[in-house]
Amino acid sequence: MSYAELIEEQKEETRDIIAALLEDGSEPEALYTIEHHFSADTFAELEAAAVEAFKMGFEVLEAEELELAPEDGGGKVVCFDAVMESALNAELIDEQTEKLIALADKHDIDYDGWGTYFESDEDDEEDESEDKPEA
């Protein structure tokens, strides 16, 4: 897949992810932890990309080794996530994605998309009620 095709595919996936979250009732105004996923065959291949992602302002989570399922070709890969807090805004996430796809391309590693977690304002309401003094 070409660089341009990957960018377009990611833009489409971004909109699908956002739509699914909002349809499920996720809080539209919340800040989300956006985790961008990278993988390679060796830790050495990931190292320079992880350092550069950190310099770009992302929190870089510790790399780990994963065993692939047989239907995914088997074997092992190493991976890390570059994380940033962000509004659930397609254009902002597109900017992050484009920068990180370019980073992966530069270091000849794989950009494996992004993910986040459902955010609910119900948790905030529960937290607030826990903080209120009892009468």
Curated annotation (Swiss-Prot):
The record's InterPro entries line, in alphabetical order, gives: RraB, RraB-like_sf, RraB_dom
Keywords of this entry: Cytoplasm
Subcellular location as annotated: Cytoplasm
Extent of Acidic residues compositional bias: 119-135
Q: Name one GO molecular function term.
A: endoribonuclease inhibitor activity
Q: Which domain of life is it from?
A: Bacteria
Gene3D superfamilies xrefs? RraB-like
Give me the ranges of the annotated region Disordered. 114-135
**Per the annotation, which location comes first and is thus the protein's main one?**
cytoplasm
Does the entry feature the keyword Lipoprotein, yes or no? no
Function statement: Globally modulates RNA abundance by binding to RNase E (Rne) and regulating its endonucleolytic activity. Can modulate Rne action in a substrate-dependent manner by altering the composition of the degradosome.
Instruction: Identify the NCBIfam families for this entry.
Output: PRK11191.1
Q: Write down what this protein is called.
A: Regulator of ribonuclease activity B
- What is the species of this protein? Photobacterium profundum (strain SS9)
- Encoding gene per record: rraB
